[in-house]
Structures are given as C-alpha cells and as structure tokens.
C-alpha cells in the first residue's frame, strides 16, 4: 500500500482506521519514518498522538518547518540529523583520553 512506500509529494493519502491505536499502528507499520502530520481540533490530543508516531519530524495542525530543529528520519529514512545542535554534532568526532 501507499503507507509502505517512501513517497515524496505533496501527497495526501487517506486510510480508514478503527481508533487511535489502529491509526498509530498503521502509521508505524513501515520501514520508513521521515515525516508525518497530525490534525485535530484538540491540540493537546494531537501532540500526544504525534509522540506515538515513529518519524523524525511530525507537523501538528500544519506547523511550519523550523530550521533550528534537528531534521532527519527514523528507520530506513536517513541516517543522522541536519540543522540545530544535533545536526552540528554530526560533524564532531569524539575522543576519549585514557590516562
């Protein structure tokens, strides 16, 4: 299904689900996890649901892209992070001195 592919859009897919647990299971049942979106009239409920989704970034109610926040995916959707302090750390090499 479209939920199993890493597609680039803009694309809107609509998949029926029974309840929030089923919706989270469908969203997380993929080897990819770059980004996603959650919309709800209840902002707190949307944020709680967004935390359950295994993606590197997720928009809540159409939130704008934040270039200061780390960007990158989970699972097979990329390695590491860009932007923000986590992105900066990708360029550091850590050394442990054993004295």
Predicted regions and their residues:
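Conserved C-terminal structural/oligomerization subdomain of aldehyde/semialdehyde dehydrogenase
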Residues: 1-99
């Amino acid at each position: 299904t479209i939920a199993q592919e890493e597609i680039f859009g803009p694309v809107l897919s609509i998949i029926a689900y029974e309840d929030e647990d089923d919706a989270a299971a469908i969203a997380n049942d993929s080897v990819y996890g770059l980004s996603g979106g959650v919309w709800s009239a209840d902002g707190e409920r949307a944020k709680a649901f967004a935390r359950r989704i295994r993606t590197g970034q997720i928009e809540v109610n159409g939130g704008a892209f934040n270039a200061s926040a780390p960007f990158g995916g989970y699972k097979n959707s990329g390695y590491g992070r860009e932007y923000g302090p986590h992105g900066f750390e990708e360029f550091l090499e850590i050394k442990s001195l054993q004295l």
